[in-house]
Amino acid sequence: WDWIYQPYLASHPEFAEIISYLRELYSQADFHIQAEPVCVPGKVDLAAPPIARATRACRQERTAVRQQLGLREEQQAILVTMGGIAGTELPLAKMRSCENFCFVLPGQGGKEMKVDGNLFFLPSDCAVRHPDLIAACDAVIGKVGYSTLAEVYQAGIPFAYISREWFRESRPLADFIDREMPSLPLTEEAFLQQDLSDMLTRLCQLPRRERGKESGASMVAAFLQGLLSF
């Protein structure tokens, strides 16, 4: 976070105290773990893949989640997550016109799930965990943020990502997505204003990437367990 806050110093000098405090705090650590994507590579005790909450993404669980949502197995489902981009209203009319696709919209419903044609509005406290929603879908549209990136990476499904260039960490995250994930870059303007059909067709044609059984979370857990066994 000290690195992330640095660009704000010119307009907000008060960040200097926060940056100094964080650097001092970090320097007291006995061990250093970095998880991909890494913005500032350094000497570490463990380098790990992206860390996401575990998913119950076996075939049976994926089918069960889709059945719970009311999605048929043959339907192409796109999860849309736009948290963190203030004031963004989803282009629902454009989504409705993409009749060959269904759109899963977490946090966009009221207290209960609502289905409107090919739009599936889910409440914020949806009973299905977010990693399992992603694993049950065929692709994701979303802004570039660590948790979304890590969960899509874990699922291995295509990602149409919207980079927030005004955030310092966005470029390293986008570079990682381009290199390690089936993906298409997408501007916020294109998402909100342009026809989505062609982009979605190209997105869903990208091959999935199978991930190994050892996740970033399991690697870190094993490392910490090793420390506790001393």
Each predicted region: which residue ranges?
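A nucleotide-sugar donor-handling region in carbohydrate enzymes
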Residues: 1-87
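Short gly/pro/ser/thr-enriched loop/turn and capping motifs at secondary-structure boundaries
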Residues: 1-6, 111-112, 167-170
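Short loop/helix-cap segments at secondary-structure boundaries that form the rim of catalytic
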Residues: 26, 39-48, 93-97, 109-119, ...
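Donor-nucleotide binding loops and adjacent catalytic segments primarily
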Residues: 53-56, 60-139, 189-190
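Nucleotide-sugar donor-binding patch of glycosyltransferase catalytic domains
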Residues: 123-124, 154, 158-202
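Short acidic active-site motifs
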Residues: 128-129, 148, 195, 219
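A donor-sugar binding/catalytic signature common to diverse glycosyltransferases
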Residues: 129-172
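C-terminal amphipathic helix plus adjacent low-complexity
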Residues: 197-230
